[in-house]
C-alpha cells in the first residue's frame, strides 16, 4: 500500500479520496459501522498529520449520508495518514470513494500559530543571538509553545523586544512564500534547518521576506498580517540550556485582551475612577494603606508599652526579684521582643517570661534585668528549660532569649514552671 498523498497545502476538502484501509480495535476490517471508533486510511487526504510540532487536523469524512468524525491524524512509518475518529452515522466500506473535509477554521487558527512560530524563532535570534536553535515546538489553534537553546534567563526588556519584533513583522504584512527545492539549493539560499532533524534530497522552504527562511513541511498563512495578534504568555527554563516560550495568536489574543479590558473597567468601577486613572488611584490607596499601617503599628506599640507598665506594677516578688509571666496571643516575635525589651530596660530586677500563640505555634520570650542576671537568673536558661514543655526548643543571651514550640495546650504549664526554676537558681 503506497503512502498517503497529502493535498492539504492547496485544498481544505476533496471529493475523490479512496478508502484503502479500515482499522477497528487494532485489526484491519472490511467495514466500519455506526458508533464504531477506529481508523480510516485514504489514498490522498487534505488532513495534516501531526508532525514537526504541528498538531493534526480534525474534520469529517463523508460518503453519502455516512459520516466519520476525524479527531486526530497521525502518520505511520509507512507514510500512511491514520485518520482516527468515530462513525457518527451510516457506515463505511473498504474501497469506497469519499469526501474528506478538514475543519477549515481550526486549520486557519493553526496556520496563525505556525507562521507566528517562525517569526518568534527569527525574533529570538535577532534579540538574543545566532546561538539560538529550536529545541522543540507545539502548534495548536491560536497558541504555540516554542523550546529553544539559550544559556541564561531572558530579561523583561529582551522579552518585550521579542514580542515587538514579532508584532512588527505581522504589521508589515510580509508575503509568506513556499518553495520545494533540492536541499543543497535551499541551504545556499540561507534556509534554516531544524537542529538534529533529518531531511531528504528535496525540502519545502517557507520564506517570510527578509525576516525568516526555514525548512518546514507545515501549513502556513500566505501573509504575516493574517496572524492578527501575537502575545507572549510565559517564558521559563525547561532543562539545562533550554528555555520555553508559550504564546497566543489571533482570536485567542483578542479574547484575552477583551477579558483584560473588562477586568480593568470593573476594577475602575469598584474604586470609583476611570481605567486611565486606575494606576494613580491604586498608587494613592497603597500610600494611604502604608500610612494607616504605620499609625496602627504605633498605636499597637503604645498599647503594648502601656500593658508593660501594668506588668511592672503588678510584678510578683520572688527573693528580691520581680517576676512577670503572661500570655498574649496574636503577637508576632518582633512585637513580643519590643514588650520584653521595655520591661528589661525599665526594671533591672525584672524576670519576664512572655508567651504568644499565633497560627498554631507558640513563641516564648524571656528577659532578665541586669540585677537578675547578676543574681544568677539567665534568660537563655529559662527558655532552654520551658520550651521543651511546649514541644520546642530555644535559647539566647543572659538578658534576652527566645524559643518556640507546637504544643499550644502546654503554654500554661510552661509559664507555671518559671517560679520553681527561678527559686532553684536563687537557692
Give residue ranges: language-model regions.
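A glycine- and charged-residue-rich anion-binding loop/surface
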Residues: 1-427
